[in-house]
């Protein structure tokens, strides 16, 4: 999860988030090289007193600065498209959970079970127990099995919301009248926090998301106790 004065991303908990971190590093390296080259050229032009006669009108230079950006864009686009397809629909999810955004809480329905659904509200600061996180704890956590592909169906009952869990690389808009889809798979157990990431009204900051990823046996025991 995030902490004070954090400069980087949260630790990756899913294969998709690991891919996104690698893509971020790849893109940042390209940006750094471009910036260094531009600064070098600017410095060179400002410090030299000589001017090459063909600098302002050279066919070779124009060819280079046309082809080079095209190559750079391809180097960025190819891994980006790969990740985009990896994030696309999975054919056989082990579990499907429907998420509905409300002003200002989330409701969840486990569609593979006959009657397993609940609302998830933020716990007020005055009711927090020692060690619990302010503005991030909820009364009902979303318990999910780890190391299994899970499909999230996301929509809204009222206004635009956005269901986001950074450590899993998830951010999907919740739009009234439209059902969006996201897939997740956690590589390790734990609690993973997120928040609504679309301004949705006065209490937008008070609708957190808490996922509890557990081994399959623990999930089966929990689901049995909830039905």
Curated annotation (Swiss-Prot):
Protein name according to UniProt: Cytochrome c oxidase subunit 2
The protein's assembly and partners: Component of the cytochrome c oxidase (complex IV, CIV), a multisubunit enzyme composed of 14 subunits. The complex is composed of a catalytic core of 3 subunits MT-CO1, MT-CO2 and MT-CO3, encoded in the mitochondrial DNA, and 11 supernumerary subunits COX4I, COX5A, COX5B, COX6A, COX6B, COX6C, COX7A, COX7B, COX7C, COX8 and NDUFA4, which are encoded in the nuclear genome.
Binding site for Cu cation A1: 161, 196, 200, 207
GO biological process, one term: ATP synthesis coupled electron transport
Organism in which the protein naturally occurs: Cephalopachus bancanus (Western tarsier)
Coiled coil: none
Keyword list, A-Z: Copper, Electron transport, Magnesium, Membrane, Metal-binding, Mitochondrion, Mitochondrion inner membrane, Respiratory chain, Translocase, Transmembrane, Transmembrane helix, Transport
Ranges of the Mitochondrial matrix topological domain: 46-59
Keyword Transmembrane helix in record: yes
Listed Pfam families: COX2, COX2_TM
InterPro entries, per the entry: CcO_II, CcO_II-like_C, CcO_II_C, Copper_CuA, Cupredoxin, Cyt_c_oxidase_su2, Cyt_c_oxidase_su2_TM_dom, Cyt_c_oxidase_su2_TM_sf
Role, per record: Component of the cytochrome c oxidase, the last enzyme in the mitochondrial electron transport chain which drives oxidative phosphorylation. The respiratory chain contains 3 multisubunit complexes succinate dehydrogenase (complex II, CII), ubiquinol-cytochrome c oxidoreductase (cytochrome b-c1 complex, complex III, CIII) and cytochrome c oxidase (complex IV, CIV), that cooperate to transfer electrons derived from NADH and succinate to molecular oxygen, creating an electrochemical gradient over the inner membrane that drives transmembrane transport and the ATP synthase.
Cofactors, names only: Cu cation
Family indicated by similarity: Belongs to the cytochrome c oxidase subunit 2 family.
Gene3D superfamilies, per the entry: 1.10.287.90, Cupredoxins - blue copper proteins
Organism taxonomic ancestry: Eukaryota, Metazoa, Chordata, Craniata, Vertebrata
GO MF annotation list: copper ion binding; cytochrome-c oxidase activity
Source organism superkingdom: Eukaryota
């Amino acid at each position: 999860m995030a902490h004070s004065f954090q400069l980087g991303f949260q630790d990756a908990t899913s294969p998709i988030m690991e891919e996104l971190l690698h893509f971020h590093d790849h893109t940042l390296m390209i940006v750094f090289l471009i910036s260094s080259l531009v600064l070098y050229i600017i410095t060179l032009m400002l410090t030299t007193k000589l001017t090459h006669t063909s600098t302002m009108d050279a066919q070779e230079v124009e060819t280079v600065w046309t082809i080079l950006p095209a190559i750079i864009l391809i180097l960025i686009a190819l891994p980006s498209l790969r990740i985009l397809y990896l994030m696309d629909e999975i054919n056989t999810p082990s579990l499907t959970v429907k998420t509905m955004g409300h002003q200002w809480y989330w409701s969840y329905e486990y569609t593979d079970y006959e009657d397993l659904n609940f609302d998830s509200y933020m716990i007020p600061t005055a009711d927090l127990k020692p060690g619990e996180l302010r503005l991030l704890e909820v009364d009902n956590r979303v318990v999910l099995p780890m190391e299994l592909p899970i499909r999230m169906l996301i929509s809204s009952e009222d206004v635009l919301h956005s269901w986001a869990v950074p450590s899993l690389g998830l951010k999907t808009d919740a739009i009234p009248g439209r059902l969006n889809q996201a897939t997740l798979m956690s590589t390790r157990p734990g609690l993973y926090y997120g928040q609504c990431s679309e301004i949705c009204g006065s209490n937008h900051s008070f609708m957190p998301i808490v996922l509890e990823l557990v081994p399959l046996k623990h999930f089966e025991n929990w689901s049995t106790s909830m039905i």
